[in-house]
UniProtKB/Swiss-Prot annotation:
It holds the Pfam family TMEM239. It is a multi-pass membrane protein. It comes from Mus musculus. This is Transmembrane protein 239. InterPro entries: TMEM239 (IPR031694). The keyword Membrane applies. It is found in: Membrane. Its main location: membrane. PANTHER family: TRANSMEMBRANE PROTEIN 239 (PTHR37356:SF1). The lineage of its organism: Eukaryota, Metazoa, Chordata, Craniata, Vertebrata. The chain crosses the membrane at residues 61-81, 85-105, 116-138. One of its GO terms (cellular component) is membrane. Keywords: Membrane, Transmembrane, Transmembrane helix.
Amino acid sequence: MQQPRVESDIIGAGEGPQRAVPWSAWIIRQDWVRWWVCHIPRSWTQWWNTSGWRQPLQRMLWGLEGTLYLLLALMLCHALFTTGSYLLSSLWPVVAVMWSHLLPAILLLVLSALPALLFAASFLLLFSTLLSLVGLLTSMTQPGYAQDLDQ
């Protein structure tokens, strides 16, 4: 089956929908390069190709970036501080009531953990003493350890 032939004029009217072209295609088209060569002075392209301008520009952009990050950090600190102080002022009665109930529980927890902590500390002290005694005894058994004290 043969397709019907469609007549078109010079701008392509009558050819139907064109296929989709990616947006990046305009960079690699020859028309863009030709326009660049014709309209941009050679001194500009030489300046663009030299690397002398890039380093100061990069330093300036890094400084600007650092300043913006510092400003952002200050704004975040200010927002957190103001929000936090507002929340603390509104939640202070709740915190006071919770603290009055939690303080005895925390004290009881600490006091009940004291015997275990004392046992662990005494065990570690005993263990380190035994290790140092073993080290002393093993070093005394070396042949070069015994010295004549009369000399």
